[in-house]
């Protein structure tokens, strides 16, 4: 049986990198007595994959991992059992069964939501003016940046890859393309914005939090974003 787990990563856990998070969940599976499937061969390992690794320093309300299990209790029980083993800052939100034919989360990630909030004392003096400039920046026809490549440099237009960007209270909400083909980090967008103002991007001025990760069930003519969690069903 394929299972998709959604979890939060908060507090000091934001400083723990992806590989250590993976090792952490391997221990969680054992401590919570999850009947996880192991690979075959000389060096068996738990069948486990993550949707989109989160950068160090970012918090999240919407991280995903897929596992395979041989047997399971209901979703509520499994969430409770795993959370009983969790350290502060980590919390399992949901545990949902997938169809046997479902692709793993990593292969279908298409977009992600982020909230960017100024740290105390790091806010611009003119906060309203900052957001007005950000809105004007987003509504440009093109947002060109220069990216280094193996053959030199090339220009990339970020605009088609930023699906939404707007002010929410005193924070920036951003929905961007995510995945193996067109992966845009919110830091890159903000760096381009500050560069357009002739200023240096202050990388530690904002706390960035991922809110959700999506698959795209649409076609080449229209996006139809669906939270990865919605592709599974609770086990009763």
What is the meaning of each model-derived region?
Residues 78-86, 127-138, 189-190:
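Short amphipathic alpha-helices in soluble, non-transmembrane regions
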């Amino acid at each position: 049986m394929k299972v998709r787990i959604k979890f939060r990563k908060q507090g000091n856990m934001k400083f723990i990198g992806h590989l250590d998070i993976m090792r952490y969940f391997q221990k969680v599976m054992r401590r919570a007595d999850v009947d996880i499937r192991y690979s075959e061969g000389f060096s068996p390992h738990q069948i486990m994959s993550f949707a989109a690794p989160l950068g160090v320093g970012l918090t999240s309300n919407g991280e995903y991992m897929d596992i395979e299990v041989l047997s399971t209790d209901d979703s509520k029980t499994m969430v409770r059992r795993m959370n009983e083993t969790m350290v502060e800052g980590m919390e399992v939100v949901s545990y949902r069964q997938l169809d046997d034919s479902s692709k793993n989360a990593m292969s279908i990630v298409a977009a992600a939501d982020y909230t960017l909030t100024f740290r105390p004392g790091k806010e611009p003096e003119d906060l309203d003016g900052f957001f007005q400039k950000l809105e004007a920046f987003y509504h440009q026809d093109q947002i060109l940046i220069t990216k280094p490549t193996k053959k030199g440099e090339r220009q990339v237009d970020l605009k088609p890859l930023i699906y939404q960007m707007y002010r929410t209270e005193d924070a920036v909400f951003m929905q961007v393309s995510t995945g193996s083909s067109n992966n845009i980090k919110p830091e890159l967008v903000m760096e381009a914005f500050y560069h357009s103002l002739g200023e240096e991007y202050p990388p530690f001025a904002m706390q960035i939090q991922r809110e959700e990760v999506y698959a795209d069930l649409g076609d080449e003519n229209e996006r139809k974003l669906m939270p990865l969690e919605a592709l599974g069903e609770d086990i009763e």
